[in-house]
């Protein structure tokens, strides 16, 4: 757990020039979500961030190893809180209390948020695809093209990014699709699949892409 404390402190001060994220996945002890969220509310509920923020998600379908994750996101050139923590020990106390409700820390990764189309906070149900791309430039171009073609019929958000550190089983990229809930996601996916020609072009032009996994999550807190 010392690694987590040091890494979170490192992320809060390190800067570079692209939008980015860092995530920490964990398996919560049964029945502890309310206690975990109370701790996080106390830690981040009144935080004033320089850019971006923090999302807490609970996994719903497909990610068997983890129950929740913490996502820190924003502009790494302007990262962290405007309001500083009262002292360094506050991090240690927070992690110690959090660990009382955590069975184990399961996975962490970091990377870039290369695009995020849409801005509707009502869409808190997310499907994540993790893949390995052999041609990142072609993959990004094909993604941008099909998102543009689907924009008139999409109500949620679509995100695209890369993994720079710790991509699951070698994943290089991720794609996120948001919806209001599970049923809304299924209906959205059905509408997307009706666009046969755009999808044909997408698969022909994105380069070799190897599927790794996909899963769904629900945003339970936004800070």
What are these regions (language model features)?
Residues 1-2, 192:
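Generic cytosolic/nucleocytoplasmic N-terminal low-complexity/intrinsically disordered segments
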Residues 3-15:
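Sec-dependent N-terminal signal peptides
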Residues 17-223:
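Short S/T/G/P-rich N-terminal loop/turn motif that feeds into the first structured element of a domain
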């Amino acid at each position: 757990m010392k690694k987590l404390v040091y890494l979170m402190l490192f992320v809060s001060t390190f800067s570079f020039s692209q939008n980015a994220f860092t995530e920490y996945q964990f398996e919560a002890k049964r029945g502890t979500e309310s206690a975990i969220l109370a701790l996080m509310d106390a830690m981040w509920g009144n935080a004033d961030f320089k850019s971006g923020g923090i999302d807490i998600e609970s996994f719903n379908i497909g990610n068997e190893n983890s129950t929740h994750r913490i996502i820190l996101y924003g502009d790494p050139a302007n990262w962290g809180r405007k309001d500083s923590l009262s002292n360094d020990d506050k991090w240690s106390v927070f992690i110690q209390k959090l660990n009382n409700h955590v069975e184990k820390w399961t996975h962490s990764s970091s990377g870039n948020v290369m695009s995020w189309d849409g801005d509707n906070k009502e869409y808190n149900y997310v499907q994540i695809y993790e893949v390995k791309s052999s041609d990142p430039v072609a993959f990004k171009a094909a993604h941008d093209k099909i998102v543009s073609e689907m924009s008139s019929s999409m109500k949620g958000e679509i995100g695209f990014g890369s993994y720079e550190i710790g991509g699951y089983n070698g994943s290089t990229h991720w794609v996120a699709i948001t919806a209001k809930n599970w049923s809304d996601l299924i209906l959205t996916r059905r509408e997307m699949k009706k666009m046969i020609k755009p999808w044909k072009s997408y698969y022909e032009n994105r380069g070799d892409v190897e599927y790794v996994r996909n899963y769904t999550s629900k945003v339970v807190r936004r800070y």
